[in-house]
From Swiss-Prot:
Residues annotated as domain RRM: 56-134, 136-218, 231-303
Domain of life where this protein originates: Eukaryota
A GO term from the CC aspect: nucleoplasm
Function: Essential component of the apolipoprotein B mRNA editing enzyme complex which is responsible for the postranscriptional editing of a CAA codon for Gln to a UAA codon for stop in APOB mRNA. Binds to APOB mRNA and is probably responsible for docking the catalytic subunit, APOBEC1, to the mRNA to allow it to deaminate its target cytosine. The complex also seems to protect the edited APOB mRNA from nonsense-mediated decay.
Record protein name field: APOBEC1 complementation factor
Disruption phenotype: Mice display embryonic lethality at E3.5 due to failure of embryos to implant.
Lineage: Eukaryota, Metazoa, Chordata, Craniata, Vertebrata
Quaternary structure and partners: Part of the apolipoprotein B mRNA editing complex with APOBEC1. Interacts with TNPO2; TNPO2 may be responsible for transport of A1CF into the nucleus. Interacts with SYNCRIP. Interacts with CELF2/CUGBP2. Interacts with RBM47.
GO molecular-function terms, A-Z: enzyme-substrate adaptor activity; RNA binding; single-stranded RNA binding
Keywords: Cytoplasm, Endoplasmic reticulum, mRNA processing, Nucleus, Repeat, RNA-binding
Broad class of where this protein is predominantly found: nucleus
GO BP, one annotated term: cytidine to uridine editing
Gene that this polypeptide is encoded by: A1cf
Span list, region Required for nuclear localization: 360-409
Length: 595
């Protein structure tokens, strides 16, 4: 069997062989090609210390395919001592468009990023350079929401090796449950990579559930000088019912009048202080404290440089994605530090850091223009239904981009033209049970979340969706969800589940329609109305013929329904807030794409 390791010194028969041999002779470094990469140094001659610490490696992307070490090494040598360079190679002898360079210390790596990013290596060819991070953390989706951290940790240790920790976040709606996913940290990148390979879809199930695994987004590192000026706190794990006034009162209790303003989004908030000392004091005093029945986590918000919007990642070069044209943001923003591992970055622009960019969106309901580029979604997006970047991590296939979909009234990144259409459920159609894991959700819909919240308020249990499919008259595969509500099903098993009268060509549309049909059947409006009780109550004999309501059911007012219906609309309203740009609308989903 042919080895991936080239014989000899790795230079025989290569392009620019003479120039490369001259480089090796001048520097004394080794140059060996193996496993699709050409390694220069690592360690360099005379190196008798330990390898450089984490943070000393940079990623260089957008390389001309016929550029090699004889041009790249002299450029990097001007900045600092090179410990190692790894140039990714194709079988045809060209490079793959990117390389990794490890310097002897962090400061040299930082200088290299500043000096080499957008450096014109050849006429009209600009390099893309950013920090490189060895990722040791995996995203695992498909975890039952009832499982606790200790159970997940124990289970992951059974099926993979090298597990160090598990990070689990509570549901925004129910703090006793998790969000349906977890982040598993391993002792090394190699251990994480081996675990990811072992956990490929279909190989292993957890608690009888199929799972999806992908690399987690690495935390954005901000230099100490920048962090030393931050006076905004990020507060997470709040109750949905916790108000901005309550948060402001709690943080002002440390020092009255210290808080300038508070902005709460779902279950997290940003607290602005007039000076940094007060912010740090409040963080130390309130981190871990129980507020409104939930222990909160308080950290400093992380300012992110504009270069964080254009990520160059390990993997096939040239697929990095950026916001262009009307959707560029030339100024610095602030980064939500925990959505690093929750799927969608949340940025905002406090006046202390930047002015508000001029935003323009289409005037009519529809798609964004192709100024905003996109890539194929990862399994995290399929499970969480929000875009997830994975920048600067090992082996992620160049998948860096800024998440900004979910803009309220139907704004999505432009893709294939899609026509919303429902199909009649005709006699003789055969409905076949299906599994949703292998199907890609198309967008975030609101009706399923409304139904879930109504069921929670009335103690009916979690709605159960069962996917079926049928072949239409035009030979298209059509989908239909049957919906079962546990409490009602136990009372009326003969007429359950709820079956909508139409099928859809899209899975997410079928789920939305099934939820809407269920709400309509229950007599619950999905849009606002006058004051009064519209949801089932204990004083109502039935919500519709044949369905009795449990006597312990709590009343749900129109105002509460309207609040549930407008969760997504509230997100869109943040575009008008003085310091929140539109792309902050992609706040995290509670589980698999539900807000």
């Amino acid at each position: 069997m042919e080895s991936n390791h080239k014989s000899g010194d790795g230079l025989s028969g290569t392009q620019k062989e003479a120039a490369l041999r001259a480089l090796v002779q001048r520097t004394g470094y080794s140059l060996v090609q193996e496993n699709g990469q050409r390694k220069y140094g690592g360690p360099p001659p005379g190196w008798d210390s330990t390898p450089p610490e984490r943070g000393c490696e940079i990623f260089i992307g957008k390389l001309p395919r016929d550029l090699f070490e004889d041009e790249l090494i002299p450029l990097c040598e001007k900045i600092g001592k090179i410990y190692e360079m790894r140039l990714m190679m194709d079988f045809n002898g060209n490079n793959r468009g990117y390389a990794f360079v490890t310097f002897s210390n962090k400061q040299e790596a930082k200088n290299a990023i500043k000096q080499l990013n957008n450096y014109e290596i050849r006429t009209g060819r600009l390099l893309g350079v950013c920090a490189s991070v060895d990722n040791c953390r995996l995203f695992v989706g498909g975890i039952p929401k009832t499982k606790k951290r200790e159970e997940i940790l124990s289970e992951m240790k059974k099926v993979t090796e090298g597990v160090v920790d598990v990070i689990v976040y509570p549901s925004a709606a129910d703090k006793t449950k998790n969000r349906g996913f977890a982040f598993v940290e391993y002792e090394s990148h190699r251990a994480a990579a081996m675990a990811r390979r072992r956990l490929l879809p279909g190989r292993i199930q957890l608690w009888g559930h199929p799972i999806a695994v992908d690399w987690a987004e690495p935390e954005v590192e901000v230099d100490e000088d920048t962090m030393s000026s931050v006076k905004i706190l990020y507060v997470r794990n709040l109750m949905l019912s916790t108000s901005e006034e309550m948060i402001e009162k709690e943080f002002n209790s440390i020092k009255p009048g210290a808080v300038e303003r508070v902005k709460k989004i779902r279950d997290y908030a940003f607290v602005h202080f007039s000076n940094r000392e007060d912010a740090v004091e409040a963080m130390k005093a309130l981190n871990g404290k129980v507020l409104d029945g939930s222990p909160i986590e308080v950290t400093l918000a992380k300012p992110v440089d504009k270069d964080s919007y254009v990520r160059y990642t390990r993997g096939t070069g040239g697929r990095n994605t950026m916001l262009q044209g009307e959707y560029t943001y030339p100024l610095s923003h602030v980064y939500d530090p925990t959505t690093t591992y929750l799927g969608a970055p949340v940025f905002y622009t406090p006046q202390a850091y930047a002015a508000i960019p001029s935003l323009h969106f289409p005037a009519t309901k529809g798609h964004l223009s192709n100024r905003a580029l996109i890539r194929t979604p990862s399994v995290r997006e399929i499970y969480m239904n929000v875009p997830v970047g994975a920048a600067g991590v090992r082996g992620l296939g160049g998948r860096g981009y800024l998440a900004y979909t979910g803009l309220g009234r139907g704004y999505h990144v432009k893709g294939d033209k899609r026509e919303d259409k429902l199909y009649d459920l005709l006699p003789g159609m055969e409905l076949t049970p299906m599994n949703t894991v292998s199907l890609k959700p198309q967008g975030i819909k609101l009706a399923p979340q409304i139904l879930e919240e109504i069921c929670q308020k009335n103690n009916w249990g979690q709605p159960v969706y069962q996917l079926h499919s049928a072949i239409g008259q035009d030979q298209r595969q059509l989908f239909l969800y049957k919906v079962t509500i546990p409490a009602l099903a136990s009372q009326n098993p003969a007429i359950h589940p709820f079956i909508p009268p139409k099928l859809s060509a899209y899975v997410d549309e079928a789920k939305r329609y099934a939820a809407e049909h269920t709400l309509q059947t229950l007599g619950i409006p999905t849009e606002g109305g006058d004051a009064g009780t519209t949801a089932p109550t204990a004083t109502s004999a039935t919500v519709f013929p044949g369905y009795a309501v449990p006597s312990a059911t709590a009343p749900v007012s129109t105002a509460q329904l309207k609040q549930a219906v407008t969760l997504g609309q509230d997100l869109a309203a943040y575009t008008t807030y003085e310091v929140y740009p539109t792309f902050a609308l992609t706040t995290r989903g509670d589980a698999y794409g539900t807000f």
